[in-house]
Amino acid sequence: MKPFFVFKCFLTVLLLSSCKTKSLLPGPLLAGWNGKKVCEKIEDNKHQRILKCTFKPDEGHERHYHLPHFGYTLEGSTFKIKDTTGTRIVNVKTGSYFDNNGIEWHEVINIGDSTAVFLIIEPK
């Protein structure tokens, strides 16, 4: 009986150590704003997924997470961004870009007077 107990303990440790946590939040493609989609998939292949996200004034992106990605601003505006560090106002300029190793969660709203458009490039 003792070898079986040791095997059960080993199996339990192995299974627990291989568990990956997954966010309960939607990713950027599934997250929308007031029931409306704000991102569309424009490319999805074995190397990358590219999203185009459009935010009219007073539209935003409900709380969601991001995997590592690169972003490029096709059309900028001013955003109120809320995340794990708090809330801030950011003036996002056309042609600006950013990259990160993922975002646990954030939510944004376009508080500017112009439509903003972003490309989000997620490597696979």
Task: Label the model's feature ranges.
Residues 28-46:
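Post-signal peptide N-terminal segment of mature Sec-exported envelope proteins
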Residues 20-26:
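Bacterial lipoprotein signal-peptidase II cleavage site
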Residues 86-103:
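Short acidic-glycine-tyrosine-enriched beta hairpin
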Residues 1-5:
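Positively charged n-region of N-terminal signal peptides that target proteins for export
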Residues 15-18:
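C-terminal motif of bacterial Sec signal peptides marking the signal peptidase cleavage site
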Residues 76, 103-124:
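Ligand-binding loop in jelly-roll beta-barrel domains
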Residues 66-85:
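Glycine- and acidic-residue-biased ligand/ion/polar-headgroup-sensing regions
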Residues 49-65, 82:
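Conserved short histidine dyad/triad with adjacent acidic residue
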